[in-house]
């Protein structure tokens, strides 16, 4: 196991030194392919420019999938790691280098145990998670149509290294975007009576949107609405003709998501009209809420405890994760992996503790083995 851990740490450090952002994971894709080919693992013909899809098993019986994302972020690294990013302005600040390495480790373990597998394990090395592209792109190939269950993981800087965070039902939110353009009538700053000023409309709209969560959505529902940008005009003595705001709304269910969009549109249009303006509302749905299957959350918790891995009941997060797309029509479970207490995800000083790589790989491999056995015996 020590040699296995050493190998994984070398792979991890290489990925960390060479981060690639969404849709640009060409080197990462090649390195993943090289490792899998060396292990004798079958690589499927994936019709995407980046990403890898492979499989281990008999090709018969049940099929489950293990998924890792590969993309980095446009962040300038500020750690003092000996394997700091060598690409200016790019960094693995969300642990996807860890995810990819752990799945490669699981792939190697599953290949060693291939004769014991009661079905097939599909290995998803996914591009473009950070832009909500990769999961839908992978699903759109049709190469996952026979998968019965999906499993994935994510590093967590709020959990001690070696501990897993698992929770049933809603665990991550839908990270939707909204934007509003308020159209009035511009003119001289000394003559507001000859204008239709969009600036006070914008100010009132920001305040009104803050009431959506506190007054229109049940306090028993998890929902966050943040206006994150506001702009109007470009000089001091001119009333602008337009003003803009944009922000995000996060919800934990499809019903709350629908309601949130409806209320944003209704509020923006009503406030604009009250000031004599009009509002053009844009709304973009990103990944859906991530809902873990209760029975499989219980299964993975039990398996971890059997393996001697500490488990905590994970707190829900209002961050989004496109692994949710795999679970839209299929059961599965998304697990948080404690990689040491430290700076937050997406922070330029974010780090993970690579010493838990081999244990994480073993957990993924055992999950696949045990779930295939359970499905075969069902």
Give the ranges of each region predicted by the language model:
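General structural feature for long, well-ordered alpha-helical segments within catalytic domains
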Residues: 4-11, 24-35, 62, 90, ...
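Metal-dependent amide/peptide-bond hydrolase catalytic core
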Residues: 203-378
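Histidine/acidic-residue-rich, glycine-tolerant segments that coordinate divalent metal ions
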Residues: 52-53, 73-75, 80-91, 98, ...
